[in-house]
Amino acid sequence: MSVVQNDDMDELAEIHSVNMVTFDFFDHVDHQQKTPSDRADDLNFSWSSIAENIGYVPWFENVSGCGDTRSAEAISECVVEGWRNSPGHYANMIGNFSELGVGVAFTQDSLAYFTQVFRIP
């Protein structure tokens, strides 16, 4: 099964990334104690399965294991490589999901918070 990008899923992921920056937390459970499935329900998204990966990477010239992350491509590659090297995150990436959304938000000190959300409607 191939995974396709979905604008609604991008919105779901973006909201979570922005909330992690705005409310200063890093977790799948947000500042209102809502899980990824709760947040999908709040936006009236149908789903039979949903999963989420989160990560953060600094926008910096010398990030351990990544090198210079001061471009959209480099910082994205860095977070994806981190997910690929984590069994739980990688399981989400290769799971039987049909849709994907991605969101990113930056802190004032140039730390990028990424959210990747997968679903089967």
Which residues make up each language-model segment?
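Short, well-ordered surface patches within globular domains
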Residues: 1-43, 96-101, 105-107
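A well-ordered secondary-structure block
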Residues: 36-120
